């Protein structure tokens, strides 16, 4: 039972492998978000492709509010670099410190030129060695491939500063029965399945994105497919993040596809 992002990666990899049989495509990043998704090996060398959902989050970094100096500090734990685009965002937020420092879990929109957000995304993925992006347009059942520098033409990008939990993990074995009993008590549970460290719950579709707070910890139900959910334990650590959300706005440009195909020779 694959998660949505993994299923999209697998579908894109299969599509590329079937359409361009003379080229070697291989899954590369897998669940490691610091690495590109697909490696392409041609007779002239290799490059990478990043897979993106047509509506998704695409990058983030932590900014820590300094109440004394009324500035935002770039966290040393960020996986991205403090580049020119990051500095522009920080400078903007510093000018409105009292407004942004109150951001909660709903977040506050960054009212800045979209080109800054798209620029951050392009520079971040260029640093990972990404040359092309691939996405799937559900509206017309079309795979779309375009070069990194065209990201802002294909996706609209919004920036937001909000507080979120720092991550999640598969729930420990000792917590599984507790979560199952809670789902049963609400009449939403049908069955469960364990695959390695992963707990899947089969139940009512209303479980999607449901969060249970049990013994001081939060457990969230991530939808895998209709009626099937992967349960994860949320971290108790909160960070305030600048987050970029993307939304597909353009169909395939044939010249961009030809550019990709030329690089496969």
Spans of features found by a protein language model:
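Catalytic centers of nucleases
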Residues: 2-67
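Catalytic cores of nucleic-acid endonucleases
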Residues: 51-145, 149-162, 166-221, 225-226
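Charge-dense, extended regions
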Residues: 211-265
């Amino acid at each position: 039972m694959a998660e949505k992002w993994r299923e999209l990666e697998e579908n894109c990899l299969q599509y590329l492998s079937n359409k361009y049989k003379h080229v070697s495509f291989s899954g590369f990043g897998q669940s490691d978000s610091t690495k590109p998704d697909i490696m392409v090996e041609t007779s002239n060398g290799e490059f990478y492709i990043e897979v993106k959902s047509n509506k998704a989050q695409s990058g983030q970094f932590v900014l820590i509010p300094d109440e004394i100096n009324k500035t935002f500090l770039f966290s040393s734990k960020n996986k991205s670099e403090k580049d020119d685009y990051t500095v522009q965002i920080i400078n903007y937020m510093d000018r409105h410190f009292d407004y942004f420092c109150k951001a909660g879990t709903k977040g506050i929109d960054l009212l800045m030129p979209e080109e800054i957000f798209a620029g951050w995304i392009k520079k971040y993925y260029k640093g990972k060695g990404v040359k092309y992006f691939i996405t799937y347009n559900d509206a017309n059942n079309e795979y779309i491939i375009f070069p990194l520098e065209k990201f802002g033409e294909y996706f609209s990008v919004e920036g937001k500063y909000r507080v979120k939990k720092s991550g999640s993990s598969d729930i420990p074995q000792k917590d599984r029965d507790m979560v199952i009993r809670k789902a049963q008590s609400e009449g939403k549970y049908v069955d469960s399945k364990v695959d390695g460290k992963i707990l899947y719950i089969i139940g009512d579709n209303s479980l999607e994105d449901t969060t249970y707070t049990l013994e001081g910890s939060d457990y969230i139900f991530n939808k895998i497919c209709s009626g099937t959910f992967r349960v994860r334990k949320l971290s108790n650590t909160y960070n305030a993040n600048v987050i970029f959300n993307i939304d597909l706005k353009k169909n395939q440009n044939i010249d961009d596809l030809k550019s990709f195909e030329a690089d496969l020779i």
